[in-house]
Amino acid sequence: PRLVKPVPFLYPVIKHYERPYVGAGIALYDVLATIGSRKGRAMPFHRHLSKKALHRAFPALSDHAAPGAIKYWDASVDDARLTLTVVRTAAAYGALAASRTQLVELTKSGLGRVNGAVIKDLETGTEYTVKATNVINATGVWTEETESLAGTDGGLKVLASKGIHIVVPRERIRGDVGLILQTEKSVLFVIPWSRYWVIGTTDT
């Protein structure tokens, strides 16, 4: 929980008829967030804002940019720190963690079941064989490459995506919340991040 920070966003409604269906979609988002929370809601429900309230929240927007907006809450997390926290927690419960290692081979039992791995210490070049009851492939965009080391195809296709973002100092854009804006083919995010704004699409 200490790594997750709530982030408010505005979705400017360009046309008045957008309010009902966009609001309904975000309301569903609220419902799912409530159902998925074990200890009650962690963030407020969405709100409909007038043109004046929109301008107060994000003065950098033109007065004529939109007749209003919908404010909703999302969250941000430092994924590197989250991963490190998971590793440290596992180590505290008795797991052995090894950084700077490379998977060389997945070993199999006589029945053809994966039962361990050969890993290489990238600092010394030494290879070790590790036996395991279960082996979990959590290698992200390298999932298929890892599967190939076992000589099998798990049927899971993972496609890499790329995002290009512009990073702008916070003082260059007057606003207190994030923005999600419709473009011709996609959406554009303006996300507050530390002392900066991160501006860009999800994928390119």
Model feature map: region roles:
Residues S99-N115:
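A conserved short coil-to-beta-strand element within the FAD-binding core of flavoproteins
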Residues K51-P59, V87, L188-W197:
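Structured alpha-helical segments in the cores of large, soluble enzyme domains
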Residues P1-A57:
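Dinucleotide-binding Rossmann-like beta1-alpha1 core, especially the glycine-rich loop
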Residues H48, A97, T129:
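Short aromatic/basic micro-patch
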Residues I35-A42, H55-Y93, V114-V118, V130, ...:
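Helix-loop-beta segment of a Rossmann-like dinucleotide-binding subdomain
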Residues L10-K15, K71-A80, L96, Q102-E105, ...:
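Conserved short loop/turn motifs at secondary-structure junctions
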Residues L3-P8, E105, T129-T133, N137-T204:
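Active-site substrate-recognition segment that forms the wall
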Residues I119-T129, T133:
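A structured beta-alpha segment of the ubiquitous adenosine-cofactor-binding alpha/beta core
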